[in-house]
Amino acid sequence: MAKAYVPRLKKQYDDEIIKAMTEKFGYKNAFEVPKLTKIVLNMGVGEATQDKKKVDQAAAEMELIAGQKPVVTRAKKSIAQFKLREGMPIGVKVTLRRERMFEFLDRFLTIALPRVRDFRGLNPKSFDGRGNYATGIKEQLIFPEISYDQVSTIRGMDVVVATTAKTDEEARELLRLFGFPFPADTTQKKAA
């Protein structure tokens, strides 16, 4: 009987990360160890107020990146200065969970981030105080699924990683063990 496929980062979490987190924070039970719950990708499409096709293009790109169909986000209220009416499509978002979440995270950390120009690591201060991490990407071209020739507009996106961690310190350690490229602690550099 063939074994079920397990994403690389899920296996790494089960085999190594739980053990390392338990040693560092002194958890009494493996279920206390923080874990990833979801990753939300959000792409705002401001040009959609003039051209409705821009949302469709963004949705197609997001589907290639995430591997699942995105939801179109709509304006909650009208804003005359932006020529925006309530209910107009203004972006797309995808929520990834379980295997797809781990697959995306693996591609994001090992393939996409190294392709960012002048990349010096992710901002270690982008935690929300509840153990969740948010970062932005300036262009969708860092993902290999997106062909440079087929892109009409370079768009950025938000990547939010939700965890069950109670504190930012626990979440930072969890993400560091997953391979998030946070720069070395700046306080240690100044002291040396």
From Swiss-Prot:
Belongs to the universal ribosomal protein uL5 family. GO terms for biological process: translation. It comes from the Bacteria. InterPro entries: Ribosomal_uL5, Ribosomal_uL5_bac-type, Ribosomal_uL5_C, Ribosomal_uL5_CS, Ribosomal_uL5_dom_sf, Ribosomal_uL5_N. GO terms for cellular component: ribonucleoprotein complex; ribosome. It comes from Zymomonas mobilis subsp. mobilis (strain ATCC 31821 / ZM4 / CP4). Part of the 50S ribosomal subunit; part of the 5S rRNA/L5/L18/L25 subcomplex. Contacts the 5S rRNA and the P site tRNA. Forms a bridge to the 30S subunit in the 70S ribosome. This is Large ribosomal subunit protein uL5. PANTHER family: 60S RIBOSOMAL PROTEIN L11-RELATED. Keywords: Ribonucleoprotein, Ribosomal protein, RNA-binding, rRNA-binding, tRNA-binding. This is one of the proteins that bind and probably mediate the attachment of the 5S RNA into the large ribosomal subunit, where it forms part of the central protuberance. In the 70S ribosome it contacts protein S13 of the 30S subunit (bridge B1b), connecting the 2 subunits; this bridge is implicated in subunit movement. Contacts the P site tRNA; the 5S rRNA and some of its associated proteins might help stabilize positioning of ribosome-bound tRNAs. The keyword Chloroplast does not apply. One of its GO terms (molecular function) is structural constituent of ribosome.
